[in-house]
Amino acid sequence: MFRRALRLGLGPGLPYRGLRTRKGGFTLDWDAKVSDFKKKVDSILPGKKYEVLYDTSHLPPEQADVVIIGGGILGLSVAFWLKKLESRRGAIRVLVVEQDHTYSRASSTGPSVGGIWQQFSVPENVQLSLFSINFLRNINEYLAVVDAPPVELQFNPSGCLLLASEKDAATLENNVKMQRQEGAKVCLMSPEQLQTKFPWINVEGVALASYGLEDEGWFDAWSLLQGLRRKVQSMGVFFCQGEVTRFITSSTPMKTPTGEHVVLRRINNVHVKMDKSLEYQPVECAVVINAAGAWSGKIAELAGVGKGLPGTLQGTKLPVEPRKRYVHLWHCPQGPGLETPLVADISGVYFRREGLGSNYLGGCSPTEEEEPDPTNLNVDHDFFQNKVWPHLVQRVPSFKTLEVQSAWAGYYDYNTFDQNGVVGPHPLVVNMYFATGFSGRGLQHAPGIGRAVAEIMLEGHFKTIDMSPFLFTRFYLGEKLQEYNIL
C-alpha cells in the first residue's frame, strides 16, 4: 500500500483543480491607486517629475499561482503547456524566475548539439522523442505570435547512427525491436551494409549498427528557446531575473501505513533575490516547479528535500548535480561531407555535420574518474586531443587532418542515480513538482516533459505519456530506470 501511495504522491494537494492564492484583485487595485497618486503628485509639484514612491517595476509580482524556477527550455515548456491547457485565458498566473538571462549556464542548450533521436533503451524516452518531433515539425502552429516572424528551427533530418560492438549487439537489437513497437522508424545494419551506405566509416570493431530512417537529426536549440520565451510572454507569463534563496513552508506531521513518521510540507512563499542587488521579493504561490537544471538539487534542499535520516523518504535527496561537458567544433575539408548523420561511436565519442562548410561538432562524456571541475566553464583542450581525436580518427580516417576551430563548455543536469529525468510531484513537499535531471536530453524531450508536468499538476495524472516511472519516489524505492543511450 505504501509503495502505491508513494508512486502516486503522498499528502493533500493533488490534483490542483483550481489554483488560487488569496482572493481578490489586491495587486491590480493597488497598482491603480499608486498610478493615480503619482499623477496627482506630478500635477501639484512644479519642475521635474518627482518620484515619491520607489520604483518596483523590476520586482516579480507578490502573488502567483505557479512559480517556475528555471527559465530554460524545460521551464519554458512547462509554462507554455500550463497556459495552453488552462481552462480560460488568464486562469493561471505563472511566474518564471531565471537567474541567467544570457543562458550561458543553461543545462539544455549550453553543451547540446541540438540532436533528436528515438533510439533509446527506455520506452518512455522513445515516446517523448516522437511527441517532440511532432511538436517541432508543427512548431509555428504552437509558437506563432501575431505580427512576429515565424520560428525557424533549421531542422536537419540527417538521422542518427548508433554503433555497437559484439558485446552490445544483442542489446542494440532488442532496443530497436522496442523502438519499432513504439512507432519509431529505425533499421539495423550489418558492417557490410554500414560500409556501403557510409563508405567513409571504418567498420573495425563494429558488429551491428542502428540508423533512424526519419524524424531524427538536429535543430537550432537557441531558436526553440527564444520561440518558447516569446510565445509564453504573449500568453501572459511573468518573467523575473533573480535567484531563489528561500522558501517559507508550513508543515504537518503524519505517519505512513508502514509506521514511518514523516512531515508533509507545503511551500507558501518563494523568496527571490534580485540580480546584482541585496533586494528580495517574497512571492506567495500555490505551486512551485523545480526546473532549475543542474542546480535543481540545491533548490530541492532549500525546500527540505533530503533533510532527514539516510534511508528514509524524508532523507532521500534529489540526485541531480552539475556535470561539465565540452563541445568542440572542427574543420575538415576531407571529412565525410553532406551525408553525415549524428554518429554515436562505440567509444562514446559522437559527432555530426555543422552547416555546409566542412565543419563538424562533437565530443565525448568523460569517465567518472575524469569528471572535470564543475565550478567553472573553462575548456580543457587536452581532453579533445587525448580522449576524442584518437577515436574520431579510428572511426573516420579522414578526420586525421581536422583542425579544431573552437570549443565551449556547458552543464548537464546529471542524475547520478540512473541518468533519467525526474518528472512530477515530490511525495512530501506536496506542491513542489520536478522537471529536471535528464542528463543532456532535456532539450529534445522538453515539449513532452512540459506537457506531462502540466497534466499531472492540473489533472492529477499523466495523460499523453505515462511518466510514472520518472517520479521522485523511485529514488527511495531503489527502482532504477537506466537509460544506456546517452551522448
Curated annotation (Swiss-Prot):
Subunit note: Associates with components of the mitochondrial respiratory chain complex I.
Enzyme class: oxidoreductase
E.C. designation(s): 1.-.-.-
Cell location: Mitochondrion inner membrane
Mode of membrane association: Single-pass membrane protein
Protein name: FAD-dependent oxidoreductase domain-containing protein 1
Physiological role: Required for the assembly of the mitochondrial membrane respiratory chain NADH dehydrogenase (Complex I). Involved in mid-late stages of complex I assembly.
MF GO annotations: oxidoreductase activity
Phylogenetic classification of the source organism: Eukaryota, Metazoa, Chordata, Craniata, Vertebrata
Protein's gene: Foxred1
GO biological process, alphabetically ordered: mitochondrial respiratory chain complex I assembly
Organism: Mus musculus
Keyword Nucleus carried by entry: no
